[in-house]
Design a protein with these regions (language model features):
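Beta-strand-turn-beta hairpins that frame and shape the catalytic cleft
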Residues: 1-10, 144-158, 193-195, 249-257
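N-terminal active-site segment of His-dependent metallophosphoesterases
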Residues: 1-82
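A short C-terminal boundary segment appended to hydrolase-like catalytic domains
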Residues: 3-5, 282-310
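Active-site neighborhood of phospho(di)ester-bond hydrolases with catalytic His/Asp-centered motifs
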Residues: 11-13, 67-72, 100-107, 160, ...
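Active-site environment of divalent metal-dependent phosphoester hydrolases
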Residues: 16-20, 76-79, 107-115, 164-169, ...
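Extended active-site neighborhood of metal-dependent phosphoesterases/phosphodiesterases
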Residues: 85-181, 226, 276-279
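Active-site-proximal segments of metal-dependent phosphoesterases and phosphodiesterases across multiple
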Residues: 165-173, 189-234, 241
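Conserved beta-sheet core of the metallophosphoesterase superfamily
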Residues: 211-285
Length: 310
């Protein structure tokens, strides 16, 4: 694909694929217990496989989508059975070559320290995180992030903000090593000549409530802003909040559009939260158009929906 071509990117997030075969009593004797209870009494009823499959089918059947990004929380409890089911979803339901799909983890994918330290996410989805600049990853043992995928006029940069936290805490962190690597990536000639699309699960903008910001926000957001400050334009794509939204992050040289996708599997009365996906049209000048598609009440088709500015 030529660098001056248009690219269309589909954005889905927070799949929360349900596959609890490995949720044995012994493996629930940690943070997973609160998560399992939440699933049993609430989340399992809100997140539905038929909605998730409808999203995959709608994207797969479109002929104008060049690339797909998934911004985290593919699982619920970071169990092997969930990772295997999420991989099968990408392989079989979405059905696109891994070079056309970029994924990053969310806090649910690093739900326990064991899942995090064993690099369960990275091992499962390695094909969906291959980098066109393999030396760009943070200088840490077995680090796969950040990765870079050069697609026409776009440089897709995958970050992880997923770190294990205590029960009831869902905050994220980029970390010093990743920030150093990101700084070098943004200065790379192949990236500087393209429009950067940065994937991170946690949004840069914190919740208005100070307690929610502490429990659910991005801990080193100001350090990330410092790295982005010299970039004149770009796109920050996130999930985590299960809500469509659009904001701006100003930099010294310009701004980033910060856009969130709702959960692809969520059934909800709020139209801004109902299952769906976003689509972005990008050319060599930057973001041309952003639109969303929402699952209708019958669960049979997707209709255009606004991405609210908040």
């Amino acid at each position: 694909m030529l660098k001056d071509a248009h690219v269309k990117i589909a954005h889905l997030s927070d799949l929360h694929v349900l596959a609890l075969e490995d949720a044995t009593p012994a493996r629930l004797m940690n943070k997973r217990l609160t998560g399992w209870l939440n699933l049993k009494f609430r989340r399992a009823h809100e997140h539905q496989a038929y909605a998730l499959n409808a999203v995959a089918r709608a994207i797969r059947e479109r002929t104008d989508i060049d690339h797909v990004v998934v911004t985290g929380d593919l699982t619920n409890l970071a169990l092997e059975s969930e990772f295997n089911a999420a991989h099968a979803y990408l392989r079989d339901e979405l059905g696109l070559d891994p070079t056309r799909v970029s994924v990053i983890p969310g806090n649910h994918d690093a739900y326990t320290r064991g899942a995090y330290e064993s690099h369960r996410f990275e091992r499962t989805f390695a094909d969906y995180m291959s980098s066109d600049l393999p030396g760009a990853a943070a200088m840490a043992e077995n680090s796969a992030f950040p990765y870079v995928r050069l697609r026409g006029p776009v440089a897709v940069i995958g970050l992880t903000t997923a770190v294990p936290r205590p029960p009831l805490v869902a905050s994220g962190e980029v970390g010093a090593l990743q920030l150093l690597a990101l700084h070098a990536i943004l200065a790379h000639a192949e990236v500087r000549s393209r429009f950067p699309v940065i994937l991170l699960h946690h949004p840069w903008h914190p919740p208005a409530n100070p307690l929610k910001a502490r429990l659910n926000g991005l801990d080193d957001r100001e350090a990330l802003r410092s790295v982005l400050d010299s970039v004149p334009r770009g796109l920050l794509l996130h999930g985590h909040l299960h809500r469509r939204m659009r904001r701006q992050l100003g930099t010294a040289e310009g701004h980033f559009d910060a856009i969130g996708a709702t959960s692809a599997s969520l059934i909800h009365d709020d139209p801004d939260r109902m299952s769906g996906f976003n689509v972005y049209e990008i050319d060599e000048t930057g973001l041309v158009h952003a639109e969303a598609f929402r699952l209708d009440e019958r669960g049979s088709r997707f209709e255009p929906a606004a991405i609210p500015s908040v």
